[in-house]
């Protein structure tokens, strides 16, 4: 049966994606430039195993400020401060499980808050995206 495609009976999956409007409008999706690097450029020391996720507890406003700066620079997608974040990582740092769960959620919430504040000051035809960052677990 050379040249014939054998169907497995599964319907094709929709390929619609949140990035499609950006690709259609501008041909690309511009991500932020690296949250931890910019936090370090601002003088924050990220020498804990949680890296920038440590600031979720100690300096959430710094994370929100950097997200906003990336949006102002033209980013279409900002990436949450969750790269090194994990429940075991927060537990090892002295937080309770409830606190750890709340901190993980706050990584995305801070990015969403930065996006909403940015959009309040400058309505855009395309709403910037917020993405979680998942690093190597337990690195």
Residue ranges and their predicted role:
Residues 2-139:
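Domain-level signal for soluble alpha/beta catalytic cores
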């Amino acid at each position: 049966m050379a040249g014939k495609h054998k169907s497995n009976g599964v319907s094709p999956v929709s390929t619609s994606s949140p990035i499609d409007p950006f690709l259609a409008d501008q041909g690309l999706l511009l991500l932020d430039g690296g949250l931890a690097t910019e936090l370090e450029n601002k003088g924050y020391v990220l020498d804990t195993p949680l890296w920038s996720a440590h600031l979720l507890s100690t300096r959430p406003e710094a994370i929100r400020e950097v997200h906003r700066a990336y949006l102002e620079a033209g980013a279409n997608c900002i990436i949450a401060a969750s790269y090194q974040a994990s429940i075991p990582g927060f537990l090892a740092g002295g937080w309770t499980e409830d606190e750890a769960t709340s901190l993980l959620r706050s990584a995305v919430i801070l990015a969403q808050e930065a996006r909403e504040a940015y959009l309040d000051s400058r309505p855009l035809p395309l709403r910037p995206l917020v993405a979680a960052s998942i690093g190597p677990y337990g690195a």
